[in-house]
Structure formats: structure tokens, C-alpha cells
Amino acid sequence: MVSTGEVRKGLTLIIDGELFRVMEANHVKQGRGTAFLRLTLRNVRTSATTVKTFMAGERFEVARLSTRNVQYLYREDNYIYVMNTETYDQFPVSVDLLEDALLYIRENETFDVLTYEDEVLDISLPPSVEMVVVETEPNYKGDTASGGGKPATTDTGLVVQVPSFVAVGERIRVDTTNGKYITRI
């Protein structure tokens, strides 16, 4: 349990049975009246943002979140099945939770998931990943007048703008935060 004075940005609290991540915490002390805490909260499950006000001295329960390293096994319908790399337990993760992250992970790769009481809340991708180019326009000798890139489709289905010298079958490194080409490997 934490009091209003200990609440900071980044904490995950349980309020009215729901999990909320503190996006912003403003401690307000007025000249007259009691101090209060105004929180901008994001519901961890629904991503809805709300602003709530609490009186000074109120206490909150902190959610005990854990990070687990998992391996992507396979996809079936609207779920991917992953395996905890420490306990070898297998469990499904909703594709809706992963959104665009599926474009950066392949079968048998590992990544971290954030869990609360065995419920997967979020995933954490590495800063960059290696991918193989499976489709792109051919490179023509002397075709550098435009100076721009060309679209390339990777083995996961992600379309990335790459320099004109990148060919089909080559390995590239892609930034997972913005989906941009970093380098050829």
C-alpha cells in the first residue's frame, strides 16, 4: 500500500478492482482547504485514459507485476502460443494485445511479457530485430539518381523502406520502435 504522497508516474495501482498505470501525478496544495492528488491514469486492460482526484492521505494498493521471458511457439486463430523459458509452461496470448508487434517476431524467437496474476498485460520487444527480405524490386546498375529507397517485404510480412542496394534474401536489421531500416547484415 502506498499513500498519496508516494504515488509517482509509472506505478501500476489497483483502483476499484481495475489495474491503472499512473501516467501523470499532480500533488496540489491549496492555500485554503486540504491537499489533493490529481492522477492521469491509463487502464492497463482497455488503454482508456481517465483523470481522477483523491484526497491527501488516501492509500492505494500497488499491483505486483512480473516480467517473464517467453518463446513464440505457433499461431492458431486469434492467439499465439508462447512458452515460459524458465518453467516451460505454455499459454495463449491474444493477437489483439500484440497488435503490430507480431510483425517483429517470428516463431521460436524470445521476448518479454508483463504479467499480473498469470494474465499477460503487455509485451516488450527488443530495440531491433533481424529479418530476411523476401520481396523487393530488383536493383539496376546506376539506379542511384533518385537517392531514395524502395519498399521491401520481410519474412514476417512487415514492409520496410530500404536502400536500393538491398536484394531479396539479404538479412537486415529493423528498429522495432518505428519500423525503419537500420542496416544490412
UniProtKB/Swiss-Prot annotation:
<keyword id="KW-0251">Elongation factor</keyword>
<dbReference type="GO" id="GO:0003746">
    <property type="term" value="F:translation elongation factor activity"/>
</dbReference>
<dbReference type="InterPro" id="IPR014722">
    <property type="entry name" value="Rib_uL2_dom2"/>
</dbReference>
<dbReference type="Pfam" id="PF09285">
    <property type="entry name" value="Elong-fact-P_C"/>
</dbReference>
<comment type="similarity">
    <text>Belongs to the elongation factor P family.</text>
</comment>
<dbReference type="GO" id="GO:0043043">
    <property type="term" value="P:peptide biosynthetic process"/>
</dbReference>
<dbReference type="Pfam" id="PF08207">
    <property type="entry name" value="EFP_N"/>
</dbReference>
<dbReference type="InterPro" id="IPR001059">
    <property type="entry name" value="Transl_elong_P/YeiP_cen"/>
</dbReference>
<dbReference type="InterPro" id="IPR012340">
    <property type="entry name" value="NA-bd_OB-fold"/>
</dbReference>
<comment type="pathway">
    <text>Protein biosynthesis; polypeptide chain elongation.</text>
</comment>
<dbReference type="GO" id="GO:0005737">
    <property type="term" value="C:cytoplasm"/>
</dbReference>
<dbReference type="InterPro" id="IPR013852">
    <property type="entry name" value="Transl_elong_P/YeiP_CS"/>
</dbReference>
<dbReference type="InterPro" id="IPR013185">
    <property type="entry name" value="Transl_elong_KOW-like"/>
</dbReference>
<dbReference type="InterPro" id="IPR020599">
    <property type="entry name" value="Transl_elong_fac_P/YeiP"/>
</dbReference>
<keyword id="KW-0648">Protein biosynthesis</keyword>
<dbReference type="InterPro" id="IPR015365">
    <property type="entry name" value="Elong-fact-P_C"/>
</dbReference>
<dbReference type="InterPro" id="IPR011768">
    <property type="entry name" value="Transl_elongation_fac_P"/>
</dbReference>
<keyword id="KW-0963">Cytoplasm</keyword>
<dbReference type="InterPro" id="IPR008991">
    <property type="entry name" value="Translation_prot_SH3-like_sf"/>
</dbReference>
<dbReference type="Pfam" id="PF01132">
    <property type="entry name" value="EFP"/>
</dbReference>
<protein>
    <recommendedName>
        <fullName>Elongation factor P</fullName>
    </recommendedName>
</protein>
<comment type="function">
    <text>Involved in peptide bond synthesis. Stimulates efficient translation and peptide-bond synthesis on native or reconstituted 70S ribosomes in vitro. Probably functions indirectly by altering the affinity of the ribosome for aminoacyl-tRNA, thus increasing their reactivity as acceptors for peptidyl transferase.</text>
</comment>
